[in-house]
Amino acid sequence: MRFVFDEVFNSDTDSPEFEETCSTTSSTSSQCPTPEPSPAIKLPSFTKVGTKKLVNESVVILDPALENALRDLNLQSKLIPINEPIVAASSIIVPHSTNMPLPRASHSSLLDNAKNSNATAPLLEAIEESFQRKMQNLVLANQKEIQSIRENKRRVEEQRKRKEEEERKRKEAEEKAKREQELLRQKKDEEERKRKEAEAKLAQQKQEEERKKIEEQNEKERQLKKEHEAKLLQQKDKLGKAVTNFDKISKMFWHYKDKIAQIKQDIVLPIKKADVNVRNLLSRHKRKINPKFGQLTNSNQQLFKIQNELTQLINDTKGDSLAYHWILNFIAKAVVHQAETEVRVKPESALPLGKLTLYLLVQFPELQELFMARLVKKCPFVIGFTCEIDTEKGRQNMGWKRNNENKWEDNTSYDERMGGILSLFAIITRLQLPQEFITTTSHPFPIALSWHILARICNTPLNLITNTHFVILGSWWDAAAVQFLQAYGNQASKLLILIGEELTSRMAEKKYVGAARLRILLEAWQNNNMESFPEMSP
């Protein structure tokens, strides 16, 4: 540590005990390169000091820390000893910068005076006092620096702790969020598991209920079937002895032909002039109903679904009588069309179509007359009607169609269409009523109608019998022979032998393909290999 004399000596310039007694500057002997004047040294007035008796000052006890600091500074080594000669110099150079080393100055005259005048004690006291003040300032500055360092360390430590606390809280928040997310995921998984279990349980219960319902329905059908067979047995003698009245059949045929004309006059044409809202409603329903028949499968579940949808669509039109009959007529046409297109190539499809048709016939009684009229128009064999086809009118009455070239369709196409329609009719006659209608409604197309068809064809004049008659008999056999035997027993067996053996023998010379197939079916039955359409699945 270095001290600048101007700081030491000039610190108390205002003290009355000091005055300027000498000047150490010399313009001739100064070797200082700076043009600035050298500072003056203010010393106590020797005249006053010399005459004034020094007062013994009390000993100052320093703080141990300060005393150690002073000892470390070794100030004694930095002061000029009293008895050491001082190299003469023309002037004392005191640098303005406190960072520059203090050059040695020559004060031989001053020291000599100090020695001689015994005035060194006050000077030393002044120096010591000034030095103590400087040291106190240094101590205070050091204390402030230490305090500042401690404060900085405290702030740094607080900041570190704050960051650590924030990091800890952040990690805790993240962990908490993760735990909450995990709990939420587990909760969702548990809810999903419970939902699936509930759905599976509900589906199982529903299947069990449906199974029980089907079993109960089958049991009731078996009981009703027995009762129905008992009633049929009472009628079989009358039916066996009945004589075919072709005049009555002809009147029935023309009745349904007239019904077709009436439908056109009273239902179809008026709808074209009806309110636009009604026409729009029917148009929408028509587009919805058309594909329903093609969606039928061998599944009862699918059948029930389509039944409900069609029932709802029909009920929507009940508010308007004209619209209601129009939609029923449209459904009758659609069913017959499905029979002559789909059933002709896939006869077993007649079973779901027949079940749907029977349900609609019972649910909407107004449909029965409309449906029968459409059947007779397309296939008069359903009532046992036959006429000559060597005329234009005769072919039209028997349901022949013209192709795109305005020519009559070929025999194969005609036979297939008739077989498809009669398969549907035979299925309807041998089906039991839906469970909900058994006790309240009679069968609209009972199995007795199948007896009528067979008996009337057997009684038809041989000159009117064609291959088509044998084709439709074969279609009927596939669809209803098993149930016919169950219904009429021994009388049914006699009638089957009549059409399968005697009628085919009478027409043997014609070599009809349909007759040959009918004999094959007869032989299969006689060999206990009679087959029927497979029952529908649940």
From Swiss-Prot:
Subcellular location: Nucleus, Nuclear pore complex; Nucleus membrane
Highest rank taxon of the organism: Eukaryota
Known outcome of mutating residue 353 to A: Partial loss of activity
GO biological process, one term: mRNA export from nucleus
Keywords from the named record: Coiled coil, Membrane, mRNA processing, mRNA transport, Nuclear pore complex, Nucleus, Protein transport, Translocation, Transport
Coiled coil: 131-244
Biased composition (Low complexity): 21-33
GO CC field: cytoplasm; mitochondrion; nuclear envelope; nuclear membrane; nuclear pore; nuclear pore cytoplasmic filaments
Region annotated Interactions with NUP42, DBP5 and GFD1, chain positions: 257-538
Entry membrane topology: Peripheral membrane protein
Short sequence motif Bipartite nuclear localization signal 1: positions: 154-170
Region feature Disordered, mapped onto this chain: 9-39, 151-226
UniProt effect for mutating residue 358 to A: Partial loss of activity
Keyword Cell cycle: no
UniProt xrefs under InterPro entries: GLE1, GLE1-like_sf
Known outcome of mutating residue 356 to A: Temperature-sensitive
GO molecular function, one term: inositol hexakisphosphate binding
Motif Bipartite nuclear localization signal 2: chain residues: 272-288
Pfam family, one: GLE1
Misc. remarks from the entry: Present with 1040 molecules/cell in log phase SD medium.
Function: Functions as a component of the nuclear pore complex (NPC). NPC components, collectively referred to as nucleoporins (NUPs), can play the role of both NPC structural components and of docking or interaction partners for transiently associated nuclear transport factors. It is specifically involved in a terminal step of poly(A)+ mRNA transport through the NPC probably by binding the ATP-dependent RNA helicase DBP5 and GFD1 at the cytoplasmic side of the NPC.
Family: Belongs to the GLE1 family.
PANTHER family assigned: GLE-1-RELATED, MRNA EXPORT FACTOR GLE1
Subunit structure of this chain's protein: Component of the nuclear pore complex (NPC). NPC constitutes the exclusive means of nucleocytoplasmic transport. NPCs allow the passive diffusion of ions and small molecules and the active, nuclear transport receptor-mediated bidirectional transport of macromolecules such as proteins, RNAs, ribonucleoparticles (RNPs), and ribosomal subunits across the nuclear envelope. Due to its 8-fold rotational symmetry, all subunits are present with 8 copies or multiples thereof. GLE1 interacts with the NUP82 subcomplex via NUP42. It also interacts with GFD1 and the ATP-dependent RNA helicase DBP5.
Protein name: mRNA export factor GLE1
